């Protein structure tokens, strides 16, 4: 029974992987736009206005100014 379950799960994983690869080939523009959106995110430099620590390169936002 365990062997059958392992084979079933392996087959499901292979099917999902093949489906994802096929989807990437059909819609390459979506893949590029998601890659570009990741590359375009940047952190705020010193003395720029911020709202939270994670937006600053230094991870320090005090009184809405990056330090």
Curated annotation (Swiss-Prot):
One Gene Ontology cellular component annotation held by this UniProt entry: extracellular region
Disulfide bridge positions per record: 43-57, 50-61, 56-66
Tissue spec: Expressed by the venom duct.
GO MF annotations in UniProt: ion channel inhibitor activity; toxin activity
Subcellular location: Secreted
InterPro entries: Conotoxin (IPR004214)
Propiece span(s): 18-40
Entry-linked Pfam families: Conotoxin (PF02950)
Signal peptide span: 1-17
Keyword annotations from UniProtKB, A to Z: Cleavage on pair of basic residues, Disulfide bond, Knottin, Secreted, Signal, Toxin
Comment field on protein domains: The presence of a 'disulfide through disulfide knot' structurally defines this protein as a knottin.
Protein family: Belongs to the conotoxin O1 superfamily.
Protein name: Conotoxin AbVIN
């Amino acid at each position: 029974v365990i062997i059958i379950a392992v084979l079933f799960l392996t087959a499901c994983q292979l099917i999902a992987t093949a489906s994802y690869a096929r989807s990437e080939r059909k819609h390459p523009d979506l893949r590029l736009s998601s890659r570009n959106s990741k590359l375009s995110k940047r952190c705020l430099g010193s003395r720029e206005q911020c709202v939270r620590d994670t937006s600053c390169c230094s991870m320090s936002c005090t009184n809405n100014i990056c330090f």
